[in-house]
């Protein structure tokens, strides 16, 4: 056997069929697509249909669900709070809660509470009443001389 004698096995490569080239070809006019209907038109694919093969969304396992009662918190970074204090929208000694943040324009509306996050720097001594707080944010507030109280549904979890 020589390199120039190597060939594919018989039937390994199927020759393509040219459709729509006359009645005598056996695949003329409609080209094996049948008559009329969505599937006979060009440019139309049925979403998720993989030619009879089991579609990907059915091959993969079902997973999880969307909890309708999951609380939706407003995330507020310490940098935003400090900017509001610097602009005179928040009092330095006041207690900062969801209502105060809405009034200051830091958040548009209070959802299920406010979660305090640590991005940015807080210089003002403030006491916060929030639904949730990250460990680093709590540390930063206490470092600035303030305090954080967790209120609402997360308060029970924090107390335990």
From Swiss-Prot:
Pfam family of the protein (one): Ribosomal_L27A
Swiss-Prot/TrEMBL keywords: Ribonucleoprotein, Ribosomal protein, RNA-binding, rRNA-binding
Swiss-Prot/TrEMBL GO biological process terms: translation
MF terms (GO), sorted A to Z: rRNA binding; structural constituent of ribosome
Entry keyword Ion transport: no
Entry keyword Repeat: no
Gly residues: compositionally biased ranges: 21-35
Domain of life where this protein originates: Bacteria
GO cellular component labels: cytosolic large ribosomal subunit
Biased composition (Basic and acidic residues): 1-13
Similarity-based family: Belongs to the universal ribosomal protein uL15 family.
Subunit structure: Part of the 50S ribosomal subunit.
Entry protein name: Large ribosomal subunit protein uL15
Organism annotation: Parvibaculum lavamentivorans (strain DS-1 / DSM 13023 / NCIMB 13966)
């Amino acid at each position: 056997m020589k390199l120039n004698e190597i060939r594919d096995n018989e039937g390994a490569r199927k020759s393509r069929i040219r459709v729509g080239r006359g009645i005598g070809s056996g695949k003329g006019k409609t080209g094996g697509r049948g008559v009329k209907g969505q599937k006979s038109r060009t440019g139309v694919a049925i979403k998720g249909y993989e030619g009879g093969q089991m579609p990907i969304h059915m091959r993969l396992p079902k997973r999880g669900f969307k909890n309708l009662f999951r609380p939706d918190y407003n995330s507020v970074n310490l940098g935003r709070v400090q900017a509001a204090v610097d602009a005179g929208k928040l009092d330095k000694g006041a207690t900062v809660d969801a209502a105060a943040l809405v009034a200051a324009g830091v958040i548009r509306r209070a959802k299920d509470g406010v979660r305090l996050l640590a991005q940015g720097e807080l210089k003002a001594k403030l006491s916060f009443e929030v639904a949730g707080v990250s460990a680093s944010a709590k540390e930063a507030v206490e470092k600035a001389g303030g305090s954080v109280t967790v209120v609402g549904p997360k308060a029970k979890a924090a107390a335990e």
